[in-house]
Amino acid sequence: DFGGDIVVIHLGINDTDPRDWPDYRDSFVKDYIELIDSFRAANSKVRIMIARLTPIADRHPRFLSGTRDWHGEIQLAIENVARYTGVQLIDFHEPLYPYPFILTDAVHPDSEGAFIMAQTVYSAITGDYGGLKMSLLYTDNMVLQRDVPLTVQGIANAGDRVTVSIADRQMKTKAGLNGKWSVTLPPLKAGGPYTLKISTDETDLQYQNVLAGEVWLCSGQSNMEFMLKQASTARDDIPRAADQQLRLYDMKARWRTNAVEWEASVLDSLNHLQYYKDTEWAICTPANAARFSAIADFSAIAYYFGKMLRDSLNVPVGLICNAIGGSPTEAWVDRASLEYQFPAILKDWTKNDFIQEWVRGRAALNIKKSANSQQRHPYEPCYLYESGIRPLEQYPIRGVIWYQGESNAHNWEAHEKLFKLLVNSWRKNWNDACLPFYYVQLSSLNRPSWPWFRDSQRRMLNEISHIGMAVSSDHGDSLDVHPTCKKPVGERLARWALNKTYQKNVIPSGPLFRGANVRGGKVFLSFDYGKGMRSSDGKPLQCFEVAEYDGIYYPATAEVVGEQVK
C-alpha cells in the first residue's frame, strides 16, 4: 500500500542472463508497463524514472552466445516503455560503459560504479548537473569550422535557459532533463576574431579571439606525434612559422609508454581515462614559434599539412592533434563497434595474438605493478577512443589526417578490418558519413611484412569512400621507423584535401597503380595520376620485380612508356 513520491526502476539485466529472454521477451514490455501502472495507482502524482541497463562486459562467459544481443534488445524495449508511458528515462549505461573494470564480475558494478549510478539518480531527481560546462576544446583562440551549420553543445542544470551568441548570430535553448543541450547556429564565413558567449542565468562563459576556418583532426601513432623540432627541415621552417591564423590544439600524453613500470597513481589515472594533459588552443605567434614551445613541439606532419592549407586557402586553420606513439588501430575504435564486429580482439588483449607482440609486451611492462586484472592501458582496444576521441564531444571538424599502422603491420588482414571499423567509427561519432579521411602509407623500413601492409593500404583506396593515401616510402629510412623528412608527407596529405575536399585544381597524388596487362611477353602497368610520369632522380626506374604463377619474384627492367610502365 506504500505510495512512493519518486520511483527509480532498473530492470532487465537478469533477463539477459539467466537466459530467459527467448522465452519471456513477449512479456517484458507488458510486465514493465504493469509495474509502472501499479506505482501510479498507489500515488497518482508519483514521479517515475526508469533506467537504461548497466553494461555487460565483453569478458562475460556468454557474451557472444546471446547475452550481448539480448542486452541490446532489452535496451530498446526499455526505451519504448519510457516513450509509451511518458516516464523519465535515465541512463546507467553511458556513464559506466567506458569503465569495464568497474564491472568486477562483468555484470555488477562495484562500489565506484554504485556511486556513479547514485550520482546519475541524484542529478535526474534534482536537475543538478554541476551548472554550465563545455568541452575542454572550448578555450580562447579556438577555431570553429566555417561554412557549415555550427553545432554548439554542452551541459547545464536541467531546465536552465542557455544562450549562445557569436558575431551577429544568437540561439537560445533549454537544457533537457539529462542536462544536455545543443544549438545549431547559421554557418560562419571564414574570419574573426570573434567572441563566443555561452550563458545561463547563473554562469557566463566567454571565449575570446575565436576564428572561423578549417578544422582538422590529426591522429595516429608516433610518426604523426613526431615533433616539428625533430624534423630535418626544422631549422629553416621554425623561424618562419609565425602565423596568427594557424591555431594548434595539442593533446599530449601525461605519461609516455616508455620501457618503465608505472606507479599506482598513474595506473589509477589510466583506469579513469585521465591520460591526456590539459591543454588549450595556441597561436603560432613569434613567441610560440621559438624552439621548445608550442609550434616546435607540435606534430611536424600536421604542421606542414596545416601550413599548406593556410597558404592555399587563405583562411584560418585549426589543428587538433591527439596522436600517441606506439598505439595500434584497435585502441582508436569505439567499444560497440569492436563488441559487435570484431569481438575476438577484445578477449584477453594482453595475451591476444591479434595484438602485435611489441604492443602487448610494452603494455605488460607498463602495468606490471597493477594488481587489477582489468588494468587499463593506452594500447588496449577502445582506450584511445574513450580517452582521446569521446572527450572531443563531436567538436565540428572538416576531416581527419591519419598516420598509423606500424603497430598493426604484423597482420594486414586484421588491419584491413580494423581500419574500416575505425573510419566508420569516427564518421558515426561526428554524424558525417562522408567525413574525409586522408592517411599515410607506411614508409620503407626494412621489415618483411611491410610491403604487404603497404599494398593493403593502397587497395583500401578502392574500398572506402572519401579517403586518400599519401605515399611516404620515398622519404623513408630502411633502418629507422621514424624518418625525419616529414614536410613532403604533410604536404602530400594537404594535396588530397585540396583536391578532394576543397575542389582545387591540384593533382592529389603521384602515380597510383590501376592495373596490368601482358602483351608480347612484357607487362604493361597503368596508373592513375600518371601523366608526365618519370623517376624522381632522372635515372632508370628501380625496384621493379615480376613473378610467375608460382609467386616467386625476380628483378625486372622497367621504363616509362607514355603514361605506362613497361
Task: State where each predicted segment sits.
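Surface beta-strand/loop "capping" patches
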Residues: 136, 144-152, 488, 495, ...
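Conserved SGNH/GDSL esterase-like catalytic core that processes O-acyl groups on lipids
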Residues: 1-33, 57-59, 69-72, 187-190, ...
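Acidic/polar residues in short coil/turn loops that connect beta-strands
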Residues: 104-106, 176-178, 550
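Beta-strand-rich binding/interaction modules
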Residues: 154-156, 160-168, 523-525, 531-553
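Extended acidic/polar, glycine-enriched regions
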Residues: 153-236, 312-314, 563-566
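Secondary-structure boundary elements
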Residues: 222-295
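Alpha-helical cap/lid subdomain in secreted, periplasmic
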Residues: 2-129, 308, 381-473, 477-514
